[in-house]
Amino acid sequence: MQHKVRLTVIDKKVYPELQAAYCADPNAGPCPCYHVGDTFLFARYGAADDFWHGGLHTLCQTAQTADGTAGGDVPHCSEAWDAISRYIYAGLQGGSLMRGWMREENTMIACCSDGTRPVLFRIERLDYKAVYPAALGAPDAPDAPDAPAQ
């Protein structure tokens, strides 16, 4: 089995009263790096390795342009990456993202740590391809040598 991970921006929050009280720019507004509905796809097999490049060029869908959008022509925001990368890595390896906490163990909801304008993400492990080790003689593998007679 091989795995990909789909990341979707499901919500953005902004707390103007906190920005006014604490931020150098009291009118910072919502996060400019992500847009609700942005979708990213991560793969890590063969020559593909989206994880180690901070998710650069993983953006698949956006209501905006890829220019300046995280995962497009720029890597993911470091605050967001710190919150989501552990789940992306676990998913790419086929691991449970949050067994016993979420309804489905292949899904996690996480958010970045920006306290005045957090972005919320749905992270999903996608199980997509069975890998048959024909070279090892797996009897059910396509084009595998016949299993030894019993």
Predicted features by range, described:
Residues 1-3, 35:
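Function-determining sites in protein domains
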Residues 3-4, 10-25:
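Short, structured beta-strand/loop micro-motifs enriched in basic residues and often containing a Trp
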Residues 7-11, 44, 125:
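Short, structured patches in soluble enzyme cores that scaffold and shape functional sites
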Residues 47-79:
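Short, Lys/Arg- and Gly-enriched loop/turn segments at beta-strand edges
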